[in-house]
Amino acid sequence: MTASGWSANQFSALLGAYHSGPGLTAATTSALFGVYVLGLIPGLFLGGPLADRRGRRPVVFTALAISALATALLMAGATATGLLWPGRFLTGIGAGALLSAGSAWIKELSSPPYDTVSAAGAAARRSGLFLSAGFATGGLAAALTAQWAPAPLITAYLPHLALSAAAALLAARTPETATTGGQLAATTPAAPAPAAVPAPTPGTAFRRLVAPVAPWVFVAPSIALATLPGLVDAGLTGWQTVYAGIVTAVTPGTGLLVAPLARRLAARHRIATAVAGLAAVILGLLLAAFAVAHIRPDAALLAAAVLGAGYGLCVAYGLTEVAALAPPDRLARLTARFWALCYLGFCTPYAITLLTGWFAPATVLLAAVVPAAATLALIAHRGTRRGTRRPV
């Protein structure tokens, strides 16, 4: 999971370097940022069912190999920029498969007999923490390497190759929790009978309470990572890449820090974490609009932190709901659906780039508050209706 987050975010911190080095336009780098999603969708929807049928470890191994190949293509893209496109696409495929199989694997490893002491919701928090750690460290490491190392658009990717190798070694020593046919491994206690959870419940609850929140999981950090730095760093000549690296660390880093808050909110009410997360996204968008309008890097950094908090709360909510809703033999598939909806948010920077041809960037960011507020109101309404409860 950490390798997945690292692979996704190492490119984000280098957007400024691609502007000043190979001379890629803002539209091109935004499109490269978003093409990741085109690979992520098949990675999720193929990786999830395969992990349910064939086991978690084979899918994770394959995804790590694809991710390493993608990083090699990105390194080659320093001199042949056309290779950046397949590199980003394959990055998405590898990350998608890692997310779907890895989230399910963590869920099962956080349950008896592998873990007999963790509280409910621990798996969701662990998945979010590992992913956020990869986001934070990957972007910062890439930025610092690119700032001071030779051949920055090559050497910045070397740490991910080392991390992928380490992840493969650790995965090889981790117990397999599922066997072929979508059944839990023999060492795992038998799952409750299917009749304990009515068949329509997981899908219906997912569509009503999880799907509307999911895109905001990555709308928030994608704006902070790919949009804000380039709009406020005009006065940071020579330090743009370092500033972008700091933003890429602060945004998911704040997501890590709000994990205890997410746990307390979830104990109060089923949707409390989602409501708080969406409220943070709204506040972050308002701060981002102010920072862009006044070209304030400090305010943009604060906005990135608040958007990161929104990301952390929303992802914790979504993973907790998915873990509670999904039967064991559908866990990876429902997890894949959640991540697929989340990563639609990565298209946001490209949409903002297109809209700024007609509107000021600050206006576009303010306009994004409207759908965020509408989503908050919708979830608050649906989540407080009588009869709305999470399966146990």
Identify what each model region corresponds to.
Residues 31-48, 99, 103, 249-261:
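Central cavity-lining transmembrane alpha-helices of secondary-active solute carriers
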Residues 41-80:
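Conserved MFS/SLC helix-loop-helix module at the cytosolic interface between two early adjacent transmembrane helices
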Residues 154-171, 363-383:
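Symmetry-related core transmembrane helices of the 12-TM Major Facilitator Superfamily/SLC fold
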Residues 87-131:
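Cytoplasmic helix-loop-helix junction between adjacent transmembrane helices
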Residues 271-316:
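C-terminal transmembrane helical hairpin of 12-TM major facilitator-type secondary transporters
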Residues 244-267, 277-284:
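Transmembrane alpha-helices of Major Facilitator/SLC transporters
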Residues 118, 122, 126-175:
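Helix-loop-helix hairpin linking two adjacent transmembrane segments in secondary transporters
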Residues 311, 317-364, 368:
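A late C-terminal transmembrane helix in Major Facilitator Superfamily
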